[in-house]
Structure formats: C-alpha cells, structure tokens
Amino acid sequence: ATAARELDTLSLHRPRNSETLAGLYWSGRAWEQLGDSAIARTRWSEVITREPGSYYAMLAARRLHREPWVPAAGSDTVVADSGAVAALRRAQILADLGMDYEADLEYDWIASRAERSVEATLAAAHAFRERDLAPRAIRLGNRALSSGAARDDRLYRVLYPLAYEGALTREAERHRLDPALVAALIRQESNFEPRATSRVGARGLMQIMPAVGRQLASAEDYHTWDAELLYQPDVSLELGTAHLAGLLSGYAHVSHALAAYNAGSSRAKRWLEKAGTDDPEVFVERIPYRETRDYVRIILRNRELYRSMYGTKG
C-alpha cells in the first residue's frame, strides 16, 4: 500500500508529462495487486483522460477492456491548390526522368507555398502522402500540428502515413507479421525515408546495417550483393521483415524483439535476464537504455495508431 500511495503522490501532484502518466498507470497496477480494483480503474481512466493517444493510455485501455483511442474524424475535404498541383505534375515528370534534384526543388516550392495557412499545409501534406513522399508529409504534418491544427484523423494520416503499402503488406504477410507493426517500426526508424542513413551506418526504410543486410540477403538467396541495395524500398522491406520475423520467433513478446532490433540481441537477452520477470510491461520499464526504452514504447503505441487508422492487424 505504501508503494501505491507513493506513486499516487508522484503522479497526481506533478505536471503532466510521460513520468506522470507512468506513475498513474503503475499506481493502478499496484492498487489492483492490493485488491482495490476501484482505485485501479480510476487511475487508469485518469491516464486515458490526460493523454488518450499515449503509450500508457494504450496499456490502461487494455486493462479497462476499452477500445484503443482513435483520432476523431476530420473533414474529408482537402482544398487543392492549382499552383501546387501543377508543381506536383512537374516534379513527377522530373523524377521519372531521373532529375531528382530538380524534382526536389519543386517539392520545396510546394512546401514553402503551403506556409500561408494550416489548411494549405495540410493540403500539401496530403498531396505528398498520396505520392509516397512520406518524409515530406510528416514534416508538414508536424508544422500543421505546431500551428494549431485539429488533432483529428486528417492530421494523423499525414503524421503516420502508410507509404509503400503494397510491398509493406506483401512482405509482412509473407513473414506472418502484423503490417501495423512493420509500419510503426519504419515510422520510428526512418520516417519512411528510403535514403535514410543513421550515424552508425544503418540504411534504408528499416535501417539495416550492411553486415546484417549481407547475412539476410544470403538467406534470401540473393545472387549478388551491394549494401546500396538497402536504399531500395522493396529490398529494405524484404530483408527488414525477414530480420524482424526472425527476432520475433526467438522471443516471447514483441517488446523483447523490438529491443533486440534496436540494441542487438545480446543486450536484449541480458536485459531479459536482469529484468527477472515474464511481464513485458515490466521489462520495458527496466530497459536501461533510455533510447531503446522510448523506442519500444513509441513503436507499440504507433502500432495501435496504424491499426485504428488503416485496419492493419495481423
């Protein structure tokens, strides 16, 4: 009871942030273990009220047997900008001709033109999203969010796009993966930027290290290999989903596999041993690397967003 009350004190009288939500959620779990389900349910309901789209609200909703949070429906109307539409056509022609630099200039002009209003920003973001230009859509979505755009599904669909949907779904299904999990992982790893390169050298949509890519390519019967292939979306999806499926087969819970994807299997196994529990929620809290801990939480939360918005559930 003392621990539960201490969690209450920390969470109920502090500014609203992720630590507050964690305190409320774990206070609920502590009260539940003490047999007071009424207080537990109150704490979990408070988490959902404060931040309905958060990781801890997702966990709380499960405890309360509620449906996960879904962004409210927004307007279906997106006002087209004739100048932007013409620029998009020019950019597509330039890209088809291999003139990527010139195409990027057109895209930059569209993004700059969209600054005049939140509505224009959202319209441009949706235009980019529809053309699988997810990184640009996300950037404009964040701009719209910071400018006061309504937090409805029209905004969230550009903040959480589903680019390369055909290849993503195909490779996810081939490896019996939840497409929403794959999309959430890519959203965190690269923002759907096929040319993304991390500071340690991971490449492509699913941020595969060249040495790992070589091993995966060999297992997938690639006759030739070049690390540059990791920048091709189809290749990244094929090898990345194979890698993720392999990790999932070796762990009891998706959170363990995500920790291994981010920090390596040797660390994930060591953390599992030190955690001393089969409870995946406790495991996540006990990951010693903040980067990996946040990584796992964000992907698990975003998986629910992708499921709710796109109906992608394996």
Model-derived segments and their meaning:
Residues 1-2, 12-63, 67, 71-79, ...:
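Catalytic glycan-binding domains that act on GlcNAc-containing polysaccharides
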Residues 83:
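Acidic/His metal-coordination segments adjacent to aromatic residues that form catalytic metal sites
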